[in-house]
């Protein structure tokens, strides 16, 4: 059986620009893409923590070290400058692969600089964020 599983995310990034008149996509600092194992052109889900909007688009590599998270095209109707977003990717894998796969989680802080890298999708590294009630850590459910 092939399953669609969580592959990686850039957690709680801040949107640096949004422009309705650009070709649709999301521009992401190449350092963040590399850290999250997301390729230019890869499908991403964007969850807007600020307003609850969810959408899918593809990535465009942005300048390294710039911290850019730029919402381009029609998505700019839903996601705005200074919104907090989560960029998520998924991958298809066999059940056996899924049981051992370790996702990449990139926690960012001010100016979208990397704070911490991890592999637990429920682990929070932002002050005030907690693990969801009853959620097991990756290590606990894999053993």
UniProtKB/Swiss-Prot annotation:
It is an enzyme of class 4 (lyase). PANTHER family: ASPARTATE 1-DECARBOXYLASE. GO terms for biological process: alanine biosynthetic process; pantothenate biosynthetic process. The modification Pyruvic acid (Ser) is found at residue 25. One of its GO terms (cellular component) is cytosol. Belongs to the PanD family. It holds the Pfam family Asp_decarbox. Heterooctamer of four alpha and four beta subunits. This is Aspartate 1-decarboxylase 2. Its main location: cytoplasm. It catalyses: L-aspartate + H(+) = beta-alanine + CO2. One of its GO terms (molecular function) is aspartate 1-decarboxylase activity. Keywords: Autocatalytic cleavage, Cytoplasm, Decarboxylase, Lyase, Pantothenate biosynthesis, Pyruvate, Schiff base, Zymogen. HAMAP family: PanD (MF_00446). InterPro entries: Asp_de-COase-like_dom_sf (IPR009010), Asp_decarbox (IPR003190). Its EC number is 4.1.1.11. Is synthesized initially as an inactive proenzyme, which is activated by self-cleavage at a specific serine bond to produce a beta-subunit with a hydroxyl group at its C-terminus and an alpha-subunit with a pyruvoyl group at its N-terminus. Its cofactor is pyruvate. Binds 1 pyruvoyl group covalently per subunit. Pathway: Cofactor biosynthesis; (R)-pantothenate biosynthesis; beta-alanine from L-aspartate: step 1/1. Substrate binds at residues 57, 73-75. NCBIfam families: panD (TIGR00223).
């Amino acid at each position: 059986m092939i399953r669609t599983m969580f592959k990686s995310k850039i957690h709680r990034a801040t949107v640096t620009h949004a422009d309705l008149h650009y070709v649709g996509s999301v521009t992401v600092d190449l350092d963040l893409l590399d850290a999250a194992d997301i390729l230019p052109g890869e499908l991403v889900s964007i969850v807007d923590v600020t307003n609850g909007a969810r959408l899918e688009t593809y990535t465009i590599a942005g300048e390294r070290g710039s911290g850019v998270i730029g919402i381009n095209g029609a998505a700019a109707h839903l996601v705005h400058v200074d919104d907090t977003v989560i960029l998520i990717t998924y991958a298809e894998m066999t059940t056996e692969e899924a049981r051992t796969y370790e996702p990449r989680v990139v926690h960012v802080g001010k100016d979208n600089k990397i704070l911490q890298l991890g592999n637990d999708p429920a682990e929070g590294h932002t002050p005030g964020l907690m693990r969801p009630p009853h959620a097991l850590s990756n290590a606990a459910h894999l053993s």
